[in-house]
Amino acid sequence: MAFTDRVEFTKEMKKEGYTILAPNMAPIHFRLFENLFASYGYNVEILQTRGRQIVDEGLKYVHNDTCYPALLTIGQMMDALHSGKYDLHKTALIITQTGGGCRASNYIHLLRKALEKDGLSYIPVISLNMSGLEKNSGFKLTLPMIRKALGVLAYGDLLMLLHNQTRPYEKEAGASRKLVDDWTKKLTDMFAKEKGYSAKEMETILPQIAEDFANVPVTGEKKVRVGVVGEIYVKYSPIGNNDLEEFLFSQNCETMVPGLLGFMPVSYTHLRAHETAAISYA
């Protein structure tokens, strides 16, 4: 198969229950996204793998002059394919593609090149984008799905923020983590019943989440607050930043990581710029 060919993710593949592997980035958010996709019939699995082998796999297929996030995301997916855990003839991959100036828009092509090099070019790679860059008959982002995804981002941002604010001060170790897990389950159950996404519902649920975290017994001491900024993948991904949040926690610090919702206007700006300039992705 020529590298220029693209294997489409078809409706038949969705019906057959293909496993769709996705690299991890923001653990709290992506657990919610995994459940959102499941509610639409997509068997998405967010990869939880860690270890040096991911870097080694990435170095096999991605030039070391390419950015580290590309090496890690592609390495994590190739490592999963080589694990023997999946039926490679019923497996697909998914990766985001913003369409902006960042080289992240080209990760998908680097991934397909890696698959071709490894003799796995028959595995479909889905582009997760809102810019019309690529389309697949078996995977579609609908307006209701996008609206729900924005809700997931809001919930994920709040859970991440409150967990980071509470964990360094909690009297009972693990109390804030338990709240994250409990609310993830509650939200998942709501999503399955088509609830929890409307503005009216969120106006009720978001304060409930905040109240639960506010009720966690804390020590009240003052600690150094450390903000984490930078490239989006490295900022959120534990394997991208060498578990920076855990390291800061071990150093008696409170971590502040900005929410993912703040990235959405950037993606929207890319889309509007292309529309205004009448540039086609075709």
Which residues are covered by each model-predicted region?
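An N-terminal assembly and electron-transfer interface module characteristic of large anaerobic redox
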Residues: M1-E275, S280
